[in-house]
Amino acid sequence: ILIEPDKNEYIRLKKKYKKFNDIKVFKDGIAEKDTNMTLNIFENPAMSSSLNRKNISPLFWGERKSQIRIKKKVYIKCKSLDNFILSNKLQVDFLKLDVEGLETKILESSNKIFKTMLGIRSEVSFADIFGKNKNDPGSFVDLHKKMIENNFTLLNLDYDGKGDYFSEYLISNSRYGVLQNTDAVWIKNLSFIFRLNDEVKLFKIVSFLILNNAYDLAIFILNKSSSKFKKYKSLDKTNLYNFVKISILKHLYKLKWIPGQKISNHKKIFEKIFGEKYLSMNEYNENVEINPY
């Protein structure tokens, strides 16, 4: 499900995904409540927002300054996240939020989504990009509090030590700049996960972990739950199972070149989890699921 209030972006997305029957694009805005809002369309459409954006990032002080100039204003109809879910009869497992400053208000007014949601990725700020005063701490603090209250754990941040830089006098492969915003990822906490009696939900969580660079936790959960779900044999004909199995196999295969890793341990953990033969050497390279071309 993709939600886009900007007409031009909505048309672009509809065209991009028109061949995908399982992808739906909605021309809606999401806000803290059902309302009409003014959307500021920036020269860089990806930064468009209903809020006034402060120019505090040095990345937009030079030749990129024009990107945060308002090109036009459009009026949009918005729904609360809960009402959007209700009106479209959705059950949301995962959520990606990038609404240029409204993330906190949207989630603080949402309750229904937390009854089904297993993981979330959201843009977060650590500076007063959209704040009204100089002491605004950004959105991360309030978002993290909301997630903790709903039994979520912070998985990771996309931040890799490379922030918004203030001059060219830096070493590109080192840490530099100031962290102003990034994406944060949360998942349901482990106590919730290990209480699950639904292996489909478990595999959805594991898939989310894989897609968010958390193979260690994915393998830990699969290993701990393998006996409970009888090596997941009820799922072994599904695309979900196959995605997880092949992803874990590829990950373990890459580890063999890292000092201290043992292929025998990779074989042991894979076969314990899935109850299938661990492929190595030519068996791995010749497998059409792993290397289809």
Language-model segment annotations:
Residues 1-293:
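Phosphate/nucleotide-binding beta-alpha loop and adjacent structural elements of enzyme active sites
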